[in-house]
Amino acid sequence: MSQKSNFFQKRYSPTATRRYYGKIETNFIQPNLADIQIKSYQKFLDHDLEKLIASYFPIKSPNDRYTINFRGLHRTEPERDEAQSRAQSKTYEVGIYADLELVDNDKGTVKKARKSKKNIASNTNGVFLASMPLITHDGVFIINGIEKFVISQITRSPGIYMLTKSQLKLSNSRKRVQEGYVCEVLPANGSVMLIYISNKKKIEDAFVQILLRDAVREGAKIFPITTLLKAFGLNNREILKIFKNNEFIKRSLEAEIYNAKDFLSNVDPEIKNLLKEFRDGKTDLRRKGIASDQKLRSLVNEYVTLEKQYNALKQTSPNDSSLTALELEMENKMDSVITERAAKHIVNELSISLRDIENTEECHEVSFHALLCARFFRNKRYNLSNAGRYKVSRKLRLTERIYQKTLACDLFLKDGKLLLKKGTLLLKEEIDKIKQAAKNNEISFVNKMQLTTDGKAVDLAKESLFYETIDVYITNDNLSVSVPVIGIHNENDLNKAMTLSDFIASISYVINLPYGIGKYDDIDHLGNKRVKLINELITAKLESGFTRMERFLKEKLTIADGVNRGQQINEEGQVIEQGEKKELTIKSLINSKPIQIVIKDFFNTHQLTQFLDHQNPLSELSNKRRISAMGPGGISREDPNLDIRDVHYSQYGRICPIETPEGMNIGLIMSLASFAKIDENGFLMAPYRKIKAGVITDEVEYLTALREDEHIIAEISSLVNISNDNKILDKEIIGRYRSMQGLYDPLKIDYIDVAPHQVVSIGSSLIPFLENDDSARALMGTNMQRQAYPLIKPYAPAVGTGQEHKIASDSGLTMSSPCSGVVSYVDNSKIIITSDSSKKETVNLVKFERSNQNTCYNHKPIVEIGQRVNKDEIIVDGPAVNKSELALGQNVLVAFTTWNGYNYEDAIVISERLVKEDILTSLTINEYVAQCLSTKNGDEQITRDIPNVSDANKRYLDENGIIMVGAEVKEGDVLVGKVSPKGQVEVSPEEKLFKAIFPESVQNVRDSSLKVSHGGDGIVSAVKRFSIANGDELNDGVIEMIKVYVVQKRKIQIGDKLAGRHGNKGVISKVVPIEDMPHLEDGTPVDILLNPLGVPSRMNIGQIFETHLGYAAHKLAVRSLISSCFDQNKAKEFAIEINQPQARVERLIKGLKNQINDRNIKSEKEALEKLDNSDISLVLKEIGMSFDDLIYKIATPIFQGVNFLDLQDVMQEAGLDPQKNQGKFKLIDGRSGMPFERPISLGIMYMMKLNHMVDDKIHARAVGPYSKITQQPLGGKSQNGGQRFGEMEVWALEAYGAAYNLQELLTIKSDDVQGRNRAYAAIVKGAAFPEPGIPESFKLLTKELQGLALSVSFIYDDNTQQDSNNVSILQSDGEQDEFFNDFEFDTEGY
């Protein structure tokens, strides 16, 4: 790593070279920007899917007669490739087959699935489960021919959190909030638990409680924490021993009823009745209660038996030594009774289903204790996941809490040596000693406790409970009061389920918080959030499908098993009689429909599955790197919590602080930072270089947010002085520790950033001079780049950041060379490369395809025959790509000045040159689909013989009735002629006879042709025809499908939206002829006039820097061209600098030399003075170039690029004296020929045409559909609706007294049905307009008033009244207006 001043030529590809002004040069290799989801889905297909299926097997029948085993997974080859899937509107997918075997344990036979018609061709064994979509090399899914993408979700990570306030979500959007010292246990699968000490009581009276949500989510129940510990199998003595008689724990024991010493005296009615029953000699254990109760009855009976033995022995031998043993045995038995009774109490309070334990295979016995343990200590019911276990282990380890505390006991190693003595202040060095000793398993602070419960359930079946404990003093000043700090043992690290050790360590953390031991968690910290990639999202969805399949399978096995010995099932799963028994097979048992439905729902209706944003390469790549906090289990967009949406310091280098939507989704939809990665647990990581003893090494480490919090990290900037051997020379440099920034000694710094722009996303990193823009404008600029419409002649920005090539390369819209070799053939549709091994590789190009956003997807080769190419080198430009660099717009000459008020309020004035020369012209491709269906009345037909359509309207249809490619179509033209059979009608005998004689002349069909929609004028670019007769797969009921693609060439026009990269946007208000535009003194007309008032208040000064630097880059190219005419040695270097082929540049120099010779110019200085833009323009046109090609490309990376001094140097080099003109130039008004009063800021700015074009928005309606209820016109362009004339518009007309206009608008132009029909008739007949009638909306109002029990009637001028119910608006009663004699009206339609 080294620092550079000024610039050097940086070559990104053979066609892309830029002047690089970055101050920091690094050899860090940027990761591929699009491969995160590709690798994730590949992992799912290769590992996760098989692991998921294997977790459900083996499945056994209730009586163990049958067992189904899973032996592996197989995939077929895809039936069609990516191109075919897109063309045929099919899914790019493979078949998934499971290798299952059915074992009959009675007969000892093993059966496997035989090949079916579906898998016989693929030579795949097994049961077909589902068709699984494949991810393409671009990282997208093709679902029904449409490219889709699954964005990642960021959620709170499972784990244990210490908070001052938390909540449990209940049903019906209710919440249960708890405040105090709260430990929130958040599992990946299972219910949230809150272990807390309430702040509603004095700390001297408070005790530890637990809040649990019931099984039906209707409410939440509170228990003393010791009640739960006892239900898990601990007794009073063990609890007090673990927590060393802590006062909070003592008060918890006092608050509950399950204490051995007073349990019998305060016994609950159930135990009291059982004791009475067994003491009276009634020993029928099964007489009462369900199976789960039998354990409790058995324990009470055993206790009574011991009690009787004790009493009998005490009477006969009061001094017998065995009495003590009996007392201990009775005490242990009472502990077991308490455990079972406490467990029953919790189970009943939480409404936990007893079927879970009575039907489970996970427990060795049926008891409430076993049920409770199975619920909290089993993976399937309570799962922390790998990420959750990592978080829990990290949170509950001792060393996290004892920093800067004083040791209250001696710490010994296992060999008896003293590690740390009592009274030691635990700082980083001492804690590192403890960590190292624990890592080597040398320390002896691990406690082992024997459990007294006789239950044999789940984790508690182990004989011992392991936990770690260290005593520390509460304060370092008062060394008299100590508390135990309890942590979990390392053995738990691989266990995804909760353990009793976890509970105990969590309780210890809570009771230590009031003493200031431990720290609260920040739930907005990225260390407490994780990203769910597609493999996790689809696995979670598939679990529900496999669970349903497992349930169906078990039901069928129950029928097939000895449970119903005389019955078996057929392949549909139905019971068959004894006489028609069939052999049981795998296929008759497996029902895979739930899995197929789940996969289909996931890729079609899941909240995080979206249409891929194909607007341009940047929008596609940004879409793939987007993460959402919404989705299943996520945050609602209506949630007003600003803390969730705000920028957090832990997002540095992981999530972009700039790129996010502006609306209600702000802060909920985010983008990954440029270099961010995701680890195996889903935590975001940022790259940093390791610093050792003040020297920056080449070692790059990716750190999670939690690991980063442990280190001091420096920011890399041009202000840091670094020697040639990468040693930091400054005594102090800026660094950060967590959220604090300060000056640090380089020897104390652990890491340094790899690059300044690692903090922002790829979209934000494209904005030059980002550091000079206001954050709100930077956000707008980032978002608007994604809306840029691909142009037919795109140009890469003159002032870039150096990221343009990387984004174009990783976007997937360009094409790279598959090998190293020489180009042997190039045309419009393919490129052939002869590799170094003489093998020919063909690269097929995409031509004028339609994208999801109706943009034109077209490839253009950028190599020539005989050119040498390297592997993975870009050889084909895609849409919005120019010479392997991202090109979202055009470099245009702009001036900041007003112009007759036409650029008021951000409006933009443009030159007609942009229209005539197609500078900002784009292509839009619309798809029209016609389907020929099979109906109950007969099949539809594609034909040219369309009833009631003139030959003029069918002139472009071929003999089959399909539009010809290249035809220019207008609105309403027929694209595909199609007729549909009418419904069955009664036919007279004469018509039957006529039909029999002339069957073809009388057709009972109607016109259902596909026509060009409103505003869809264009040229037909392609027609695709699919038919069942040709073997194409179509949807049910579809005989034939025809797709017609119509291309629109959209020139820039008034109403279109333009924007720069700095959040500067506006709508075109005027297109001015070139001769009327302001121009420079040499005659160069300005392309765009921007309002200067749009700069200072928006605080995006970056656009001014870009303007000056861009103009200097253009002038530099002109000066270099002239210089090359006098020094031939500079020609090659000049060709590289302007990214043009050497041969073309030589022709350009030759042409300009002729101009110089003709004008007898002798020196370079004279040429610079006498040659103007018009002279150079003539030469450029002769060789097919324009001024847009004659410009230097500059890279100014954000936070380290061109500064004010560099800009002055560049302008000076270009002959623009910054001290003299300050970037302002004399402009002359093209209309008057007079110069403007003052010099005007002028330069070259990169402007983009956005996807907000007037052609898509402007709309007019003459006739159209009406609402059924109000009879008012519908709204919106899509429904051919009208323009709403609202309340404020009515006020405006009222203010001017325009009564008649207002009356027309509110009656005959809206919902006066009879009046508008009369008006139409009057217009046709040329008669006078009739009086308006009563609007339909008024009638609707009367009905609503009547619904409020109010009588409404009409009172006329002659004081006659009429009930509103008797007034027919649609037609007057009893009379027909004379206007309607010759007309028929459809009052419901047009």
Swiss-Prot record:
It is an enzyme of class 2 (transferase). One of its GO terms (cellular component) is DNA-directed RNA polymerase complex. SUPFAM superfamilies: beta and beta-prime subunits of DNA dependent RNA-polymerase. InterPro entries: DNA-dir_RNA_pol_bsu_ext_1_sf (IPR042107), DNA-dir_RNA_pol_bsu_external_1 (IPR019462), DNA-dir_RNA_pol_su2 (IPR015712), DNA-dir_RNAP_su2_dom (IPR007120), DNA-dir_RNAP_su2_hyb_sf (IPR037033), RNA_pol_bsu_bac (IPR010243), RNA_pol_bsu_CS (IPR007121), RNA_pol_bsu_protrusion (IPR007644). Keywords: DNA-directed RNA polymerase, Nucleotidyltransferase, Transcription, Transferase. Its EC number is 2.7.7.6. It catalyses: RNA(n) + a ribonucleoside 5'-triphosphate = RNA(n+1) + diphosphate. It comes from the Bacteria. GO terms for molecular function: DNA binding; DNA-directed RNA polymerase activity; ribonucleoside binding. The keyword Magnesium does not apply. GO terms for biological process: DNA-templated transcription. Belongs to the RNA polymerase beta chain family. The RNAP catalytic core consists of 2 alpha, 1 beta, 1 beta' and 1 omega subunit. When a sigma factor is associated with the core the holoenzyme is formed, which can initiate transcription. DNA-dependent RNA polymerase catalyzes the transcription of DNA into RNA using the four ribonucleoside triphosphates as substrates. PANTHER family: DNA-DIRECTED RNA POLYMERASE I SUBUNIT 2. This is DNA-directed RNA polymerase subunit beta. It comes from Mycoplasma genitalium (strain ATCC 33530 / DSM 19775 / NCTC 10195 / G37). The gene is rpoB.
